[in-house]
Amino acid sequence: MKTLMHICCAPCANRPIDILRADGLEVTGFWYNPNIHPVTEYRARRNCLQAYAQEIELPLILKNDYGLRPFVRAVAEDIANRCVKCYEMRLYETARQAAEGGFDSFTSSLFISPYQQHELMREVAQRAAAEYGVGFLYRDFRPYFQEGQAFAREHGFYMQKYCGCVFSEEERYIKAKKIIP
């Protein structure tokens, strides 16, 4: 079975890729992350993924457009609920790419993160699958999060400290420094 995996970063993708391959799936990676800012962060994550994909011979599709403006336009009216728009942007595009590329299903490395809104992502992915007529391969990879992070550190992967969006980065600094806006 051919599966297109949306990949947010190499640290989150390494365990899901191995698990799906061990299950006999033919995995292709898909990089599309208009939420990641600034451009230096975007490039660091993309470049790390490209090097890892080459190392493990993972076919990788890059939709390599730095998406600051489209992302901000999509979330600006309701910043408090930005995550749903972010998931929609990435998972609908992954479903579209999977359908057009002849894949049997799609999934995302996001499903390994204990920091993401897991059930919301699942609902968005199911809607995207229905809209594009492609299967959604659901796996809860969260039990492998720590193992994947350890693997990433051992292999010298770039390790980010926030989900990627500027609002998440702001929250990280406000919480860390206890700054009152």
Residue ranges and their predicted role:
Residues 1-181:
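Nucleotide-activated chemistry modules centered on ATP-dependent adenylation/adenylyltransferase
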